[in-house]
Every structure is written in C-alpha cells, then in structure tokens.
A protein has these predicted regions:
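N-terminal low-complexity, Pro/Thr/Ser-rich intrinsically disordered segments
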Residues: 46-58
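Residue-level signature of catalytic and energy-coupling elements of molecular machines
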Residues: 76, 84, 173
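C-terminal cap of thioredoxin/glutaredoxin-like
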Residues: 2-46, 164-231
C-alpha cells in the first residue's frame, strides 16, 4: 500500500459528547479551533488484524447505511470521519471506481459508518443522517467533495449551503443539530468501534473482517478483493 498519513484519534469521549446546544455553539464560535489537531501516522501495507464478521455486522445504534446486495461475496465496512482529508481522498478517487466496478455489479456490499473525530465531523454526520436514506450518500459525497469549504473556523454557513442543496431549510438544519438521540447514537457507535474493533484512526476499512488502516488506492482495493472473487 502506498504510504499516506491518516487522521488519528486524539480526542476523548467527554469532548465528543458535548451536548446538542453546545454543538451549535461550538460550531458558531469556530468548530475547528476547539479541537486539538489530529496526529498523523503512516498507512500500513497490508491487513493489520482481523475481527469477527458476526460482530462486525451487528448494525450500529442508528442502523447501518449500506450500498450493494446482501449476498455479495465481499463486505467492506469503512469507518470514516467527515473532516478527515484522507477519507475525502478515498471517496473522491477510489470509492467511485469501487462502486461502479464492484458494488453496482453485486460483488461488494459497502457499509459506511461514521467515526467523528471532532464536533464538526459529528455535525456533518448528523446532517447526512437527517437527510434520509435516499439523500444520505449524496450528502456524504458532497461534504467530502467540498471539505475545504466547510472545514474552516466558521463552518455553519458553508455547511448550511451544502445541506440546503439536499433540501434542508434553516429550521430543519438547526433541528437536526439539536437532535440528542442522533448525536448519542453516533457517539455510541464510535465508542463501540474503538473498543470492539480497535478503530483508532480514519479511514479504517474491514474487508471480509480483515483490518486495513489508511486510505486505499483502486489498485490496492482490487488486490485485496480479488481472492474472494475467484471461481
């Protein structure tokens, strides 16, 4: 695998679960500056372990966001933070090819799970969830594609501009960011991923249970998927 840095977990649960009113206040005051900058680490050149597929496929507290057929021979689970630049890179480069070549042809089932590293990532994940099933992945794609526009010191206005394209009004935007149940569900899944599957950086992928930390190129993904498609 090509060596690339990845965003590492540097924040504690008490900072992630900051409360719904406080979340909006933090974003209004400057959502990025509130956090320590993430450390960087080299991506690994191969699988770094393996987890139980039975455990991995237990849905997240809010339910999983899935693309592809349930009987696909390969299941890929990605844990990503919406503010992670290497997650954005994967979704702008490898993901479109993966979806066209493997997901849309019934070879891969793709499960995307949120692993927010900061309040801004948490807010973007909440907005994608609030958008609904049909608009979830398009809004995820939009946030990744325009990451440089909204991962800024004053993020609320550019975030709303993106969310507005998915049908949000100012009222529904504010209501979403004040949804404590959704916030708690995302935080609970982040905690489960960390404790159960040793996810401590983003992006982290599980390909049929094998763990890969760091972004994957299309060629690297082809290499890892190929053995499961033989015969």
């Amino acid at each position: 695998m090509t060596t690339q840095p990845e965003a590492s977990l540097t924040v504690t649960r008490r900072y992630v679960l900051i409360g719904t009113t406080a979340l909006i206040a933090v974003l209004a005051a400057g959502g990025v500056g509130f956090w320590n900058s993430p450390d960087t680490a080299a991506a690994q050149s191969g699988p770094s372990g393996e987890v139980s597929m039975a455990d991995l496929l237990v849905p997240s507290p809010l339910g999983d966001e899935i693309q592809g057929q349930a009987d696909a021979p390969v299941t890929i689970v990605e844990y990503a933070s919406m503010t992670c630049p290497h997650c954005s890179h994967f979704h702008e480069t490898t993901y479109p090819e993966m979806k066209k070549k493997y997901v849309d042809t019934g070879k891969v089932r793709f499960i995307f799970r949120e692993f927010p590293l900061d309040p801004l990532a948490l807010a973007a994940s909440m907005l994608a969830r609030c958008a609904g099933k049909d608009r979830y992945f398009p809004l995820i794609d939009a946030f990744f594609a325009q990451q440089k526009d909204w991962v800024v010191q004053k993020p609320l206005q550019p975030m709303f501009a993106i969310a507005k394209q998915a049908g949000f009004t100012q009222q529904t935007f504010d209501q979403c960011l004040a949804n404590h149940q959704m916030e708690q569900g995302l935080v609970d899944e982040r905690t489960r991923a960390q404790q159960k599957f040793n996810v401590n950086s983003t992006p982290t992928f599980f390909i049929n249970g094998k763990t890969f930390r760091g972004t994957l190129t299309p060629e690297e993904l082809d290499k890892q998927i190929a053995p499961y498609l033989k015969g």
